[in-house]
Amino acid sequence: MCLIWGLFSVIIASVAQLSLGFAASHLPPMTHLWDFIAALLAFGLDARILLLGLLGYLLSVFCWYKTLHKLALSKAYALLSMSYVLVWIASMVLPGWEGTFSLKALLGVACIMSGLMLIFLPTTKQRY
């Protein structure tokens, strides 16, 4: 069950990151503070997505807290790297996002997935 909480945390954090990225690209820049505040107070789609992203991070922290009660920190922390993979894939697949495929990024994803497999594969104890 602890791994399930960890996966929930990763998925929710990935969705939250995508939501915040969407909101940041559609809201006025914070350098124009009054325009930014006005957009937040209007509570349009962009502001609602920003709020959902922030709430998503809060929910992700709760799931992370539940994960750390049962799963070793070394494994739990490594699990968070899956978020990078999910966000990269989602940015290429979802309409409106401008994620680009590159061999460098694919190599990075392969390294992350290889590391996760090394950490999470069951080990066999050798008898001497």
Swiss-Prot record:
**InterPro entries, per the entry:** Flippase_ArnF (IPR022832), Small_drug/metabolite_transptr (IPR000390)
Family under the similarity heading: Belongs to the ArnF family.
Show which residues sit on the Cytoplasmic side of the membrane.
1-2, 57-76, 122-128
The record's annotation in SUPFAM superfamilies points to:
Multidrug resistance efflux transporter EmrE
Quaternary organization: Heterodimer of ArnE and ArnF.
Q: Has the keyword Membrane been applied to this entry?
A: yes
Can you say what this protein is called? Answer: Probable 4-amino-4-deoxy-L-arabinose-phosphoundecaprenol flippase subunit ArnF
Any idea where this protein resides? Cell inner membrane
Q: Name one GO molecular function term.
A: carbohydrate derivative transmembrane transporter activity
4Fe-4S listed as a keyword: no
State its role.
Translocates 4-amino-4-deoxy-L-arabinose-phosphoundecaprenol (alpha-L-Ara4N-phosphoundecaprenol) from the cytoplasmic to the periplasmic side of the inner membrane.
What are the annotated GO cellular component locations?
plasma membrane
State the PANTHER family in the record: 4-AMINO-4-DEOXY-L-ARABINOSE-PHOSPHOUNDECAPRENOL FLIPPASE SUBUNIT ARNF-RELATED, SMR FAMILY PROTON-DEPENDENT DRUG EFFLUX TRANSPORTER SUGE
Originating organism: Shigella flexneri
Q: Which residues lie on this side of the membrane: Periplasmic?
A: 24-35, 98-100
Which keywords does this Swiss-Prot/TrEMBL entry list? Cell inner membrane, Cell membrane, Lipid A biosynthesis, Lipid biosynthesis, Lipid metabolism, Lipopolysaccharide biosynthesis, Membrane, Transmembrane, Transmembrane helix, Transport
Q: Which cysteines are joined by disulfide bonds?
A: none
Q: Its GO biological process terms?
A: lipid A biosynthetic process; lipopolysaccharide biosynthetic process
Query: Which pathway does this chain act in?
Result: Bacterial outer membrane biogenesis; lipopolysaccharide biosynthesis
Any transmembrane segments, and where? 3-23, 36-56, 77-97, 101-121
Membrane-related topology note = Multi-pass membrane protein
